[in-house]
């Protein structure tokens, strides 16, 4: 069955993937496409709705992202968000100006709830604004359907042509009515049915991989984390023994993790699994390296090189499976947004890679990946395993990575995870881990002065990895963790707890 499709046209907005997630929550399939996509290609896919993302540019900028006016002539409902509204107004003959004072943060907005976009929503609401430019004059055929004290065109609509624009961000949690507004756009305006689900996604992906691969051989970059595990199971269901899973034990894993991975995939899933012990090789390459981006690149490149060597032993291999997911992609930047940090799944690949990539989860958020995993029958414990970056403890040891430092952070992390589980918080907190900042401090232990390592504890709550809040762990739990680490882990005399959210911080320290 052909699924309904909504296109999100990306103009460089930091929330483009979040818009996609909000659409998917309504069981509507969507794809994010660059603003440079031709109108012909858009028409070919027959979308039922189009959403313009926000973006950091001004419509008057020399190199600002644009789109052809034809997009409004293909008889498909359009919703422009922030820069998307400004661009729609600009293209259709309205005026956009730069404000004297930037409007940023929570703002009261007055809505015309006779407009289909705001149907069933109370007239006075709170929304999230983040803009400098604004629509000062709407195009012919449009009406103003929302305003704030600082923005006279907080939303505009041409209901006959089903073209809408909002200056605020309906996709973020800070706009409480945003989900209802997007639902109105999808179901009342675009008249969608909501026929997409993770079950249908998995079925289609298995079929797609089977057709793509044919009788060729595939290897999978298996780490034992949720993403690579679900990716491996999807591909295994598609092609069976044509898949060989290569588990590179780079010595940067959590305590006992290597043995657990080997046991689960060999015994539970009966997969072809090769475990490669490459700790000395990775630590050798990382010796003396302190810059985080360089560490990521080294780990990513060495990871692939190990794969190439194993592939040569197996004969002709055509495809490599990776567990890349949406937040991996957005954190590595796009054509229209600045790079935050290169992600191990997308930024560390050498240019001369010898395999074609299969990334079955590239379009999914973490919560969707977990749901797919459960649909595929992967054990609950594995599906809800803590997110763990590909570079592993290599980026949780800040500065140079050594065997001694790895052992310290590995033991501290195991204690932290154990106490979180003992407190019944292991499935209530989205992600939690210990890291080793490149800091030593003075302490007193056994009446003697010490000058030892500091351990940083990080725990956050999130549903998709795009944004997160620091977790409010009970003091008594933190106290127990601190006492145990200082007493049980040699070389540590101080524990700190990270209380910053994302943004401004990323979840990992490096």
UniProtKB/Swiss-Prot annotation:
Keywords: ATP-binding, Glutamine amidotransferase, GMP biosynthesis, Ligase, Nucleotide-binding, Purine biosynthesis. Its EC number is 6.3.5.2. Pathway: Purine metabolism; GMP biosynthesis; GMP from XMP (L-Gln route): step 1/1. GO terms for cellular component: cytosol. PROSITE patterns: GATASE_TYPE_1, GMPS_ATP_PPASE. The keyword Ligase applies. NCBIfam families: guaA_Cterm (TIGR00884), guaA_Nterm (TIGR00888), PRK00074.1 (NF000848). Catalyzes the synthesis of GMP from XMP. This is GMP synthase [glutamine-hydrolyzing]. It comes from Clostridium tetani (strain Massachusetts / E88). The gene is guaA.
């Amino acid at each position: 069955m052909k699924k309904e499709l909504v296109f999100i046209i990306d103009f460089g907005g930091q929330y483009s993937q979040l818009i996609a997630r909000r659409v998917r929550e309504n069981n509507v399939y969507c794809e994010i496409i660059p603003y440079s996509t031709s109108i012909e290609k858009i028409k070919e896919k027959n979308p039922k709705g189009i959403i313009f993302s926000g973006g950091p540019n001004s419509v008057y900028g020399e190199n600002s992202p644009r789109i052809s006016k034809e997009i409004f002539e293909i008889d498909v409902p359009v919703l422009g968000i922030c820069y998307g509204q400004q661009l729609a107004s600009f293209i259709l003959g309205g005026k956009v100006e730069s404000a004297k004072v930037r409007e940023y943060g929570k703002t009261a907005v007055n809505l015309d709830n006779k407009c289909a976009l705001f149907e069933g929503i109370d007239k006075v609401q709170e929304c999230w604004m983040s803009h400098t430019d604004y629509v000062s004059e709407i195009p012919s055929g449009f009406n103003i359907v929302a305003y704030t004290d600082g923005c006279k065109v907080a939303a505009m609509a041409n209901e006959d042509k089903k073209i809408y624009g909002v200056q605020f961000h309906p996709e973020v949690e800070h706009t409480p009515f945003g989900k209802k507004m997007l639902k109105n756009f999808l179901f009342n305006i675009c008249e969608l049915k909501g026929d997409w689900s993770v079950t249908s996604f998995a079925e289609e992906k298995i079929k797609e991989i089977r057709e793509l691969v044919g009788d060729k051989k595939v290897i999978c970059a298996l780490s034992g984390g949720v993403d690579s595990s679900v990716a491996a199971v999807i591909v295994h269901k598609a092609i069976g023994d044509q898949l060989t899973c290569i588990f590179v034990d780079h010595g940067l894993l959590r305590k006992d993790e290597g043995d657990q991975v080997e046991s689960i995939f060999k015994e539970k899933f009966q997969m072809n699994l090769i475990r490669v012990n490459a700790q000395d090789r990775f630590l050798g390459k990382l010796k003396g390296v302190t810059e985080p981006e360089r560490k990521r690149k080294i780990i990513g490149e060495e990871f692939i090189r190990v794969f190439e060597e194993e592939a040569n032993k197996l004969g002709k291999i055509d495809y490599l499976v990776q567990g890349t997911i949406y937040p991996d992609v957005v954190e590595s930047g796009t054509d229209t947004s600045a790079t935050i940090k290169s992600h191990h799944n997308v930024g560390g690949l050498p240019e001369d890679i010898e395999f074609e990539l299969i990334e079955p989860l590239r379009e999914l958020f973490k919560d969707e990946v977990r749901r797919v995993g459960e649909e595929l029958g992967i054990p609950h414990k594995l599906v809800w395993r803590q997110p763990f970056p590909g570079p592993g403890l290599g980026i949780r040891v800040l500065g140079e990575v050594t065997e001694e430092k790895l052992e310290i952070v590995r033991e501290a992390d195991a204690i932290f995870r154990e106490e979180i589980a003992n407190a019944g918080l292991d499935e209530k907190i989205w992600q939690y881990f210990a890291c080793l900042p490149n800091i030593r401090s003075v302490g007193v232990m056994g009446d003697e002065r010490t000058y030892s390592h500091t351990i940083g504890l990080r725990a956050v709550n999130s549903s998709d990895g795009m944004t997160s809040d620091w977790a409010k762990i009970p003091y008594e739990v933190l106290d127990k963790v601190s006492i145990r680490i200082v007493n049980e882990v040699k070389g540590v005399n101080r524990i700190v707890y990270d209380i910053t959210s994302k943004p401004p911080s990323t979840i990992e320290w490096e």
